[in-house]
């Protein structure tokens, strides 16, 4: 993991991108994925599955992550299942990936790490 890049991304805010803005080129996507190695390419976006100790832990985690997404005004597709929360990020206005996806992924991963500490692990 590129911790320096992850810290940089997590400290930034998602930008309001106008429709038709260009999506990221593959080399830039590969570089940014180094900051969030648990996230994988999936179609036009990136996705991650968080593993938890119970269904209710997943519900609590999703509430936390949803609040962060709302603050950033960048919202993932989400699926809450037994002991799992799966998120998919992509930027609709660019019809693909933007830096916003990696900014939010970095923030969500940091929140998950803190959540795990507060919940006593997954």
Where are these regions (language model features)?
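Charge-rich alpha-helical segments
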Residues: 1-122
């Amino acid at each position: 993991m590129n911790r320096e890049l992850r810290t940089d991304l997590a400290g930034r805010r998602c930008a309001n991108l106008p429709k038709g803005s260009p999506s990221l080129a593959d080399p830039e996507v590969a570089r940014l994925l180094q900051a969030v190695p648990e996230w994988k390419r999936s179609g036009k976006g990136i996705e991650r599955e968080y593993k938890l100790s119970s269904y209710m832990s997943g519900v609590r985690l999703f509430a936390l992550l949803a609040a962060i997404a709302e603050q950033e005004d960048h919202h993932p597709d989400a699926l809450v299942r037994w002991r799992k929360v799966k998120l998919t990020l992509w930027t609709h206005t660019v019809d693909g990936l933007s830096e916003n996806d990696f900014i939010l992924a970095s923030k969500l991963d940091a929140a998950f790490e803190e959540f795990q500490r507060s919940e006593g692990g997954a």
